């Protein structure tokens, strides 16, 4: 299936619109100036590429609930929608989705809230908490756009928005949606500036990528693209900019901040993009490089391009970061738009900043590559590539084409659960969880449940103590559950299979604890005194990066961020990757922590119970028991599982995702989206709702959440009540970890690993009736989850026969 681009929107340091920014870009106008938004007086570097301080944007009724990162994104999205002339109506909204990438999310709001807390807790507005997570961004966009399909965010740092483009293309080709609003956004923040200052990675002058390479210059902005199936675009008479062919996503498995010296991961992303596009290296006319301006990044990227494209005659390369700085999570989208404009106008933007002396030095490292120094170049461009690399060792490449091109059809593999790793309040193994289901709820401390991992666990899974100490708790529990998943699946990572295995990490709150810890250090000690030890752990994809480094897994590595259901969305994404043949095996993971910081934020919002008596489906208030953990589930193609002789716990039969926009921080009024997700999951699985035997639900004790869930089941199943099983009665509201655990619990039941007699809930007249059901004859189990803002995911697991 062809996927095409029909709309573009952008704001950055050299323009508030695509046209303004592009015209300045091709004319070599730099947006790098003295930083105005934060005080850098005590820092060694003072340059930045900031967007307009104030800009016109219609953000609707929730504008005051949005961080600058969302406002920048909404600005770009409004332009892209207008450019594409797409009309999102009640009739087509279910087939229109939103996927947005970001690195630091609502960092401005985090800084404000905790600065106010330092001055006195009564000054800190709890509403700022809703603006903080990356997960808020796509929800804000969906609300102003009216999109009701798949809605999520990608948290893979500086590769995030490139991955958002690739993920949306995958979903369109899988038939999940007709059109997507994709892109990325990040605002200028103390978090990023203080962090890169701590790493001494900033250039004190304007950055000079592929040239002096002394460091980066931070930028900010947003880029948005409307992408559609070709058939959908033609049917509405849309203007088509170009086709999106293939892409590649890889992991270095090397270092949390530094690229591999041999460029292997970067080359894998580029090679896989070429392979999935059915192109050879000689076909690429233009590459918009990642080109951050640091010595290691530039040298390894040049090495990678030389190895793949070095024999081409004059492949054009440039760094638009030389003008707009490094826009972090927005970089991929901004640079994709520049790449598309270059492709459609046959104009390569310049890489600015070369002196005559620099040009002489460039000849030695450029070889046959043309780095387009200082002046734009007009040339024929048929195929163009854009590359972005990130902390965590994540690499992403995507290829755009001026012309229609047939690419290899996707595979249609059956997908099975063949292993799992469980870290929660019951312990760190499948056996400890199974035993815990027999004894009931884990011990509650106040309103909390905690997962503990100690030295004996690290040793069991080959995690060295020196490595473990570098990790924040989120990464610690993810590494342990990931390693446990590989072991439980009987998988040994080798040079032969390391690129056949990947991972999708879902998280609601990500590394909030270390983000806050880093911010508090800046507040107390100054922007110039940030912790170089803590900063690398503030990116949402650090947990996946550390798991890759420790396990040696080098395949697809993506972090999804959209509330509690991110852990179940990870199952859907991983399912797609295996089903279409991109990877043989994928770990679908959900991870969230319960630290003092996390507890304080949920408690400030009034969500945490004080005594631990609150339980799902009690319908008494808005509070719940806060849990934590990490769940990793191995999804594997039928052919791979059979070749290995792997045990199959269950089959992933199908899934559905839907969204009904409500304000960030609530789900009240979003009921219909859960109905749609459940029905879509059943349809995808090839069954009717009547064939569902039981549900593993998401109720957590908040009466609004629980009532929406049960109301949906009553509408869908009517008098044919389905027993609802709950993992949150056992491990608390562990958010994304609980969502993935729901799928693991269903798989264990279908595989006969749990007792056939299971506690469950039935509902009558709005009340929950506790009962025990015999699960021995169950064939199909539905798993559901939710996210504040109105997103829902449903997955059907089927018994293996």
What residues fall within each predicted segment?
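ACP-dependent fatty acid/polyketide chain-elongation machinery
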Residues: 1-62, 84, 231-241, 337-352, ...
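Conserved beta-ketoacyl condensing-enzyme motif
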Residues: 5, 29-156, 185-193, 281-297, ...
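Active-site pocket-shaping loop/turn-to-helix segments
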Residues: 13, 60-78, 124-133, 151-163, ...
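Condensing-enzyme catalytic core mediating Claisen C-C bond formation in acyl metabolism
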Residues: 2-6, 29-34, 206-277, 286, ...
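Acyl-CoA/ACP chain-elongation machinery
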Residues: 36, 176-214, 247-261, 286-298, ...
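Active-site-proximal alpha-helical scaffold in enzymes
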Residues: 73-85, 134-138, 142-145, 149-184, ...
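Flexible, low-complexity linker/loop segments at domain and module junctions
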Residues: 1-5, 88-93, 277-283, 312-313, ...
